[in-house]
Design a protein with these regions (language model features):
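N-terminal lobe of the biotin/lipoate ligase/transferase fold
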Residues: 1-92
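Short, acidic (Asp/Glu-rich) active-site segment that either coordinates a divalent metal cofactor
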Residues: 126-139
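Glycine- and Gly-Pro-enriched alpha-helical subdomains that act as flexible
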Residues: 102-103, 108-109, 113-114, 118
Length: 139
């Protein structure tokens, strides 16, 4: 399913291998999209090729930014900004919980990992892409 909204194209899938992997494949195939969202990932990934457990009931998404004014030097800033924005958003829904950031890419609640963020980059057809994937396990 594709949804057209004010901020671009959002694709929702019931199951994917990995939203980041799907994003990379879509970029390489010159497909137009901004967000990929999945109910379940069969092969979710974290940093350093770690496995990210992605059970049904979580939120697994990837946002792609295409901006040739950005480069690899901006990745750490984008990582920090992504963590803060996601933690802030989670806090809006579950106010009162003790949410903490564990740099560079984890969000903890009550000492347990609630969310992981994986940022990747891709150069394709003379364009620079930043791929921001995150998984929120809510069960």
């Amino acid at each position: 399913m594709k949804i057209k909204n004010y901020d671009g194209i959002i694709e929702h899938h019931k199951s994917v291998k990995s939203t980041n992997l799907m994003a990379i494949e879509k970029i390489q195939n010159n497909e137009d999209f901004d967000w990929l969202i999945a109910d379940y990932q069969t092969d979710g990934r974290g940093r350093s090729s770690n496995v990210w457990d992605s059970p049904v009931g979580g939120l697994y998404a990837t946002r792609v930014i295409k901006d040739n004014n950005l480069d690899y030097s901006h990745i750490s800033q984008i990582s920090i900004l992504s963590s803060v924005i996601i933690a802030y958003t989670i806090n809006k829904f579950i106010d009162g919980w003790n949410i903490k950031l564990k740099w560079p890419n984890d969000i903890l609640i009550g000492g347990d990992k609630l969310c992981g963020i994986l940022i990747q980059t891709l150069n394709h057809d003379n364009n620079f892409y930043i791929i921001i994937g995150f998984g929120i396990n809510v069960k």
